[in-house]
Amino acid sequence: MNVNEIIKGPILTEKSYQLMSSGVYSFKVSPKTNRSETKKAVEYIFNVKVEKVNIFTVPKKEKKLGKSKGFTTKYKKALVKLMPGYTINLFEDESPQDQKDSETVSENTEEKAKIAKKKAELEAKNKEIAEKLAKKQAELAKKDSETNENQEKRIENQTENQENSAN
């Protein structure tokens, strides 16, 4: 069996995290594999020394979803104990991640400064626009009052003309 086909993936649960601190790692493995193949595969893939391998089959479990019933699939689980001094890093290397985080923090502060500057510029433009609108509204109100006065004068002139023509 091919080394890459033996290990299907890590099993990451609360219990497996506790076991990792003592050097025991849990993997989902191919149902056709045995202890020696699993040991060779882990040593080859992760470049570590294996002390002990325990393999067992996890049985299928009944699951219910509403009215329907079903089963989870059974799988083979391997608990691999490493020699002292060896560890397997199942996650990304954390040190480059810390550098990325610090870079993103500095980028975020620069972006926040740019955003604050743009907000200030927009507020200044909004104030200018508000002042212009206020001036235009004042001019329109003045024109409206003038037109109202002119209309009143026309109406008065028309009524006077009608009275004069009636006399």
Curated annotation (Swiss-Prot):
The keyword Ribosomal protein applies. Residues 119-167 are annotated as: Unknown. Residues 1-118 are annotated as: Large ribosomal subunit protein uL23. Residues 97-112, 136-157 have a biased composition (Basic and acidic residues). It holds the Pfam family Ribosomal_L23. GO terms for cellular component: ribonucleoprotein complex; ribosome. One of its GO terms (molecular function) is structural constituent of ribosome. It comes from the Bacteria. The keyword RNA-binding applies. Residues 91-112, 136-167 are annotated as: Disordered. Keywords: Ribonucleoprotein, Ribosomal protein, RNA-binding, rRNA-binding. Residues 158-167 have a biased composition (Polar residues). One of its GO terms (biological process) is translation. Gene3D superfamilies: 3.30.70.330. Part of the 50S ribosomal subunit. Contacts protein L29, and trigger factor when it is bound to the ribosome. PANTHER family: 60S RIBOSOMAL PROTEIN L23A. One of the early assembly proteins it binds 23S rRNA. One of the proteins that surrounds the polypeptide exit tunnel on the outside of the ribosome. Forms the main docking site for trigger factor binding to the ribosome. Belongs to the universal ribosomal protein uL23 family. This is Large ribosomal subunit protein uL23. It comes from Mesomycoplasma hyopneumoniae (strain J / ATCC 25934 / NCTC 10110) (Mycoplasma hyopneumoniae). The gene is rplW.
